[in-house]
Amino acid sequence: MKEQKLIHEGLITESLPNGMFWVRLDNEDLVLGYISGRIRRSSIRILPGDRVKIEVSRYDSTRGRIIYRLRNKDSNE
């Protein structure tokens, strides 16, 4: 059975090497996020200050996969 992942929205706070980012979730948690393969293939640029959707495992809530970059109009704010 496939593991269920939790999907959160957050804000990119810092860019790290190799496509990794610090993401502050809406519930104020800090998560280390990496870019999914689809975003890498599409060469979508992610910068600090961008809002993203991130998929977090139930077992390790400190790491997650960035699956979508939100446009300004898509965000809740």
From Swiss-Prot:
Domain S1-like: 1-71
Cellular localization per UniProt: Plastid, Chloroplast
Keyword presence, Chloroplast: yes
Main location: plastid
Primary role: One of the essential components for the initiation of protein synthesis. Stabilizes the binding of IF-2 and IF-3 on the 30S subunit to which N-formylmethionyl-tRNA(fMet) subsequently binds. Helps modulate mRNA selection, yielding the 30S pre-initiation complex (PIC). Upon addition of the 50S ribosomal subunit IF-1, IF-2 and IF-3 are released leaving the mature 70S translation initiation complex.
NCBIfam families from the UniProt entry: infA
GO-annotated cellular components: chloroplast; cytosol
Alphabetized UniProt keyword annotations: Chloroplast, Initiation factor, Plastid, Protein biosynthesis, RNA-binding, rRNA-binding
The keyword Electron transport is assigned to this record: no
Superkingdom, natural source: Eukaryota
PANTHER family to which the protein is assigned, alphabetical: TRANSLATION INITIATION FACTOR IF-1, CHLOROPLASTIC (PTHR33370:SF1)
Subunit structure: Component of the 30S ribosomal translation pre-initiation complex which assembles on the 30S ribosome in the order IF-2 and IF-3, IF-1 and N-formylmethionyl-tRNA(fMet); mRNA recruitment can occur at any time during PIC assembly.
Record-linked InterPro entries: NA-bd_OB-fold, RNA-binding_domain_S1_IF1, S1_domain, TIF_IF1
Name of this protein: Translation initiation factor IF-1, chloroplastic
GO molecular function: ribosome binding; rRNA binding; translation initiation factor activity
Family of the protein in this entry: Belongs to the IF-1 family.
